[in-house]
Amino acid sequence: MKPLVIKLGGVLLDTPAAMENLFTALADYQQNFARPLLIVHGGGCLVDDLMKRLNLPVQKKNGLRVTPADQIDIIVGALAGIANKTLVAQAAKFKLNPVGLCLADGNLTQATQFDPELGHVAMVVAKNPALLNNLLGDAFLPIISSIAVDDNGLLMNVNADQAATAIAALINADLVMLSDVDGVLDANKQRLTELNSAQIEQLIEDKVITDGMIVKVNAALDAAKILNCGVDIANWKYPEKLTALFAGEIIGTRINP
């Protein structure tokens, strides 16, 4: 099977029991299957918590975090430090051979500033898969934070969904986006197994998909179009279902290009 990139939402990092469940499922899966796995993560909630403790303002423009030069070191510390090493520690506990990385390591991606008004925020594209191919070939579990470096050597914050998409494109992998939702629900609150672009557009127009779910669905749709394959939105709360998800079954909603 193709490798699988698992994108983790930051809320998971605030939920120790959920992390335990996730890595229990990963360990169980790796004992029974040979599919290479990678994790890509953000950690916005950790950043917000750290900024609050330091009495620093959180600025946003059109819903995107503004990252001024005097805050990028704090954000790097939260994402590439606290968040990444917390996940590495959990994976090590379950003997999963984790390696903590960022998007700049081994020239995995090319980063370009997204919008000067957002400061140290970048978009990334796939660049060099050699490091990941070597790690996966030796049965390591790469855990990659959404921190990048641009051509000028500047540290950059990257949207974690976009980072996961670039990593999946880099190694021709499938992508699963894990969060705290079961998937996309219809007007009767029943889970929809699969959706395509036209169906998503209609559900948004009908106000069935609203608010934060629009962001999640559009991120998955963007990824599906880039990867030219279905991208799953699923919940990390059900460890008994995660092993099936990692094996390719739909437990949430599959977003097709």
Swiss-Prot record:
EC class (word): transferase
Q: Where is the signal peptide?
A: none
UniProt-recorded Gene Ontology molecular function terms: acetylglutamate kinase activity; ATP binding
- Annotated residues that bind substrate are located at G43, G44, R65, N157
Q: Cellular component per GO?
A: cytoplasm
Its annotated compartments are: Cytoplasm
What is this enzyme's catalytic activity, as reactions?
N-acetyl-L-glutamate + ATP = N-acetyl-L-glutamyl 5-phosphate + ADP
Q: Where is this site: Transition state stabilizer?
A: K7, K216
List the GO biological process terms.
arginine biosynthetic process via ornithine; L-arginine biosynthetic process
Where does it mainly reside? cytoplasm
Query: Gene3D superfamilies under this entry?
Result: Acetylglutamate kinase-like
Q: Which UniProt keywords apply?
A: Amino-acid biosynthesis, Arginine biosynthesis, ATP-binding, Cytoplasm, Kinase, Nucleotide-binding, Transferase
User: Could you confirm whether the keyword Manganese appears in this record?
Assistant: no
Q: Which SUPFAM superfamilies match?
A: Carbamate kinase-like
Give each disulfide bond as a residue pair.
Answer: none
Q: What is its EC number?
A: 2.7.2.8
Q: In which pathway does it act?
A: Amino-acid biosynthesis; L-arginine biosynthesis; N(2)-acetyl-L-ornithine from L-glutamate: step 2/4
Tree of life domain: Bacteria
HAMAP family given in the database record: ArgB
Q: What does this protein do?
A: Catalyzes the ATP-dependent phosphorylation of N-acetyl-L-glutamate.
What this protein is called in its record is Acetylglutamate kinase
Q: What lineage is on file?
A: Bacteria, Pseudomonadati, Pseudomonadota, Gammaproteobacteria, Pasteurellales
